[in-house]
Amino acid sequence: MQDHASSKDDRALQRTRHWISGYSPDVRIQERGVLVSVGDGVAWIKGLPSARMEELLDFEDGSLGMVFDLCEELVGAVILQQTGSLTAGQEVHRTRRPLGLLAHDSLLGRVIDPTGRPLDGQSPLHEGAWVNLNSPTPAIVERDFVHEPLYTGIRMIDAMIPIGRGQRQLIIGDEGLGRTSIALNAVLHQKDKDVRCIYVLIGQKRGAAVNVMQTLQRHGADAYTTLVVADAGSPPGLQYLAPFAGSALASHWMRQGRHVLMVYDDLSSHARSYRELSLLLRRPPGREAYPGDVFSVHARLLEQATCLSPEQGGGSLTALPIAETQQGEIAAYIPTNLISITDGQIYLERSLFAAGVRPAIDVGRSVSRIGGKAQHPAIKHEAIRMKLDYSRFLELEIFTRFGAKLDPGMQTVIKRGQLLRELLKQDRFERFSPEQELAWMIAYNEGLLDEHPLTDIPAALLQIQSRLDARLSLETPREDWTAALQKMLTTADV
């Protein structure tokens, strides 16, 4: 029995000696930092001399952070996920990887945070391509001219402030004037248009995110839309990263040849979160206490929006950033920055909103610098005449407020301008197809609606929507359109 046990021990000893003889030590040097202080979503760490900007950090309690500031003695990090109790003295380790997320078609219809974690109660994503949140912008040689229209379904925008695929169009105005409604209307109108949508909510109340998701579900738009949410209760670091997460996902799909519509709601909140982080990290403040590089941050974000050349797949990324003004002051720092970065702006005016004009868009102060090049020739031809009529009406309307007498020609301009204003009014989430858009524009320019009372205009528009001949298209000759509309509007019981 003892001999058997002894031989068994010898064999085990031989195996151990054989394993040791083939062992070669591998020296790994791992940096270890120490948490010095933490508070308000910002952590200061001592050590980690090789840490890089925007590198992820693992904290001892399981929390996740990102390097956001490098000093001689300390590393400043923003907290992205706080899973335990962060206290001074805990260890911090580098991950040697930047922040990113998994991009996959299964993200359509989902609600995620900027790190890719699900917020809708469904299972996390385990497949897809890894995309860096700080993805490079497309090079000049990879881009193409904006040449395709992106219809929003809003009559005033599609006619007078057209948007093209690959354009950056700012929506700006005071709170409560319908900025989100315009963006949502544009998203809802992309149904069956082979356009994917990403809606980023930054610093909004949690109820706002729920309302947006319910609106998308109610209209069947959640099937082609992804929500990226960093609400007001999220750490400022997540609020800062939210638009970059949406942009990285949109750029990935654009590189695959897809058309993507991106909504940033809103970049004023994003600028405030960046200001908060910068002040907490002791960066020198600039105008209105914003950091000096806030312009370049927004420029880097919005430069992702473009139309790729056919050699690069022909995809596009259209951006609709939203900005908030105070008392209609568009000369403030962030609004002027965004106006100078984007390709045009849709300006909402409180006086128009109070007068019952919906959407409350000030056509005179709104502009689309490149959208007209993508507008269909038929719609563009009608819009030129309409813009002239409307601008003349706005000039003459001022004199009517003082009781000035007008000659018959001016009275005609005023009457047709009032008619056009009624035609441009639109209920929330009411949408017009491009063919219906062309129909009412021709009807106005041909004077087919001049004899209708202003109170009957909504009914006339409803007749155009419901009775429009399906055989009519944007390529149909204008004479055929005019004949069909004359027959429709004269026989309709409006």
Curated annotation (Swiss-Prot):
**Alphabetical UniProt keywords:** ATP synthesis, ATP-binding, Cell inner membrane, Cell membrane, CF(1), Hydrogen ion transport, Ion transport, Membrane, Nucleotide-binding, Translocase, Transport
Could you tell me what reaction this enzyme catalyses? Answer: ATP + H2O + 4 H(+)(in) = ADP + phosphate + 5 H(+)(out)
Write down the membrane topology: Peripheral membrane protein
Matching entries from Gene3D superfamilies are given as: 2.40.30.20, ATP synthase alpha/beta chain, C-terminal domain (1.20.150.20), P-loop containing nucleotide triphosphate hydrolases (3.40.50.300)
* Highest taxon above the source species: Bacteria
EC number, UniProt record? 7.1.2.2
State where the protein is found.
Cell inner membrane
PROSITE patterns reported in the protein's UniProt record: ATPASE_ALPHA_BETA (PS00152)
What are the record's GO terms for cellular component?
A: plasma membrane; proton-transporting ATP synthase complex
Q: Which family does it belong to?
A: Belongs to the ATPase alpha/beta chains family.
UniProt function note: Produces ATP from ADP in the presence of a proton gradient across the membrane. The alpha chain is a regulatory subunit.
What interactions and quaternary structure are annotated? F-type ATPases have 2 components, CF(1) - the catalytic core - and CF(0) - the membrane proton channel. CF(1) has five subunits: alpha(3), beta(3), gamma(1), delta(1), epsilon(1). CF(0) has three main subunits: a(1), b(2) and c(9-12). The alpha and beta chains form an alternating ring which encloses part of the gamma chain. CF(1) is attached to CF(0) by a central stalk formed by the gamma and epsilon chains, while a peripheral stalk is formed by the delta and b chains.
Stated name of the protein: ATP synthase subunit alpha 1
Q: Which gene encodes it?
A: atpA1
